[in-house]
C-alpha cells in the first residue's frame, strides 16, 4: 500500500522537471510543429498546440475579467488552463512562427488573454513571469519585433533562438527545417 507521503513525494519529483512546450503555428506539420515534437521527444515535455485550441481573442465584453477572472465570457475555451500549466511549470518553451515580420496572430491572442488570467492579482502575474522561458522563433526576417513581443513574458531579456530556414538552405513553407542535422543540434544546444 502506498502512503500519501510517497504519492506526494513522487508528484513533487515529477513536477520538479515539468516542461511545457507551446506551439503557436496553425500548420499541423510545419516547422514549428515539428520543432515542438522534436523538443518533446528529447525532453518528455507536454506539447500544447495553442492555435488548434480555438482560443477566443479578447473582446465582446466589458472587461469583466479585470474585476473577477471567472467573469471573462471566454473562460470555457481553455486559455486559463494553458496559463496555469505555464505558471506551474519549471520551464516553458514557446515555438512561434513569423507571419509578415511579426509573431503569428495566435501569439497576440495568447498575450491579450493573459489580462483575464492575471486579473488584478499581481502575485499570479509575478509567478507567471518568474517561470523560466525559452523562445524559438521560426523567422527569416525581423528579429526586433519578436524581441519586443517576447519581452513581456519574462523578467529581463528573453532567451530566443532564431531559426531561419534560409540559413540552412531551406524554404520555410516546405516545413522541413528539422530534417537538417545542424538544426537539430542547434535546438538541442539551445534547450540544454
Residue ranges, per PLM feature:
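N-terminal beta1-alpha1-beta2 submodule of the flavodoxin-like/Rossmannoid cofactor-binding fold
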Residues: 2-119, 177-192
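Short, charged/polar "capping" segments at the starts of alpha-helices
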Residues: 29, 142-147, 170-172
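Short, intrinsically disordered/low-complexity patches at protein termini
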Residues: 112, 117-118, 126-128, 169-170
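Glycine-rich phosphate/pyrophosphate-binding loop and the adjoining helix
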Residues: 151-192
